[in-house]
Each structure stands twice: as C-alpha cells, then as structure tokens.
C-alpha cells in the first residue's frame, strides 16, 4: 500500500458518514420540497470528481444528499458564511481543509490519494460562496482533473438559499438538484507556467457544464446574456488573494 493511501484512506468514518447521509435525507425531506433530476446520469462509482456551484453553506449537504457514495471533500479551512450553529457538521463528516489563498499541498495530496483508491471526491471549483451567481473556478479543480485523469460529474443546485427564509414564513422552499452527464478525462501538454492557459480553459469548461444545470439568471460569467454577464462583473474577485487563510 502506498504511504499516501495509509495517510489518506478511502473510505473513512464509515459509520459516522452513513448516519450523516441518513440525516441529510431526513433533513431535506422535512425542510424543503426537493427534486433531484438526472439520477440516471450517476455512474457506478469512482474514481470520480463531483463538482457543483457554490452559493450557499447548505451546498455540501446537498451534495451528500444527491450522490450515493461516501464522498470525500476538500474545502475551505474557514467557514465565514455559515452560521456558527452548523459549523460542527463538516468537522463531524471530516474533510481535507484548504487554506484559501495558498497552494494547500496537503489537501491536494489527499485528493489525489482518494482518487487513486477509486474514491469519490467532492469539490466546489469557485472555492467559496460569497456570491449568488456563477463565477470562474479557481485552479484547483482543473489541476486535479489533469493530474488524476478521472471523470467529472457536474451537479447544479437551485434555490438552496431559500430554505431558511421560507421556513421562517412557515413554508418549504422548492429546491432542485440537477445531475449532469459525466465528462472528461482531461489532459494538458504543457508544464509549469506553459500549462496555465490549458488549465484555465479546462476550468472554464468545468464551469460551463455546471452552468447548464442551474437557472439561466444564475449563470453569471457563463451566461449567454450580456446583461447577466455584466451584472456579474466583480464577483470573480477572490477574497483570499490578498489575505490568505492562516
């Protein structure tokens, strides 16, 4: 067994994650009117990278609800947009933290090890939920796609931000999860700086697949409507470029 597989085993926390999956099913049934579209697109298993838009702190739970596997996440070390009452949930599930604004070598090694073990990796390419329209992805998802050569499964989440406002009105929000067809693998010929344009193009292709699965008015930088693209200007600014997570 490779040393990285010992350090980053897949699957892990099986009992805890099975319980959390049941909790996610129950929570969405109680709190929202949920539709999942495209379940016929689910492959038989890994290695697989699952990607989705990231507009809400509820998104990781929605990904757990949408797919049948014990998904492994890499995600932000801090959770600035999540209510303090729910920040314990990702810690119980367990994930490999990324210190945003840094290269986060350890998290990338963990992600590679998970995929080498035919695992399923969840990642939100936008690397944060500070906006409610689609933004260009950060380099991490494209880098892992090229590095591992695995297929990618796109998900599109709609109206998750409505869940708690609707509950305060005594109503259940109508939430949709769309599952797209797997795509990839990707390869890049260049090395170092010469590879950057290829990775950027792959990143845009990944986001384009996600854009097809969300409402047109939420497609932001990937909209066909110039007015929507113009309104999204500025959302691509990454808050951690100047202030990396410690």
Feature map (PLM): residue ranges:
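Short, basic, glycine/proline-bearing loop/turn elements
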Residues: 23-24, 92-98, 124-129
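A transmembrane-helix-recognition feature enriched in membrane-embedded lipid enzymes
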Residues: 2-41, 83-93
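Glycine-rich, highly charged phosphate/nucleotide-binding loops
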Residues: 33-35, 102-108
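Flexible, charged surface loops at secondary-structure boundaries
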Residues: 42-45, 116
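Conserved beta-strand scaffold positions in the cores of enzyme catalytic domains, especially
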Residues: 36, 73, 95-97, 152-154, ...
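Catalytic core of membrane glycerolipid acyltransferases/transacylases, capturing the structured
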Residues: 44-102, 110
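Non-catalytic C-terminal accessory region of glycerolipid acyltransferases
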Residues: 1-16, 106-246
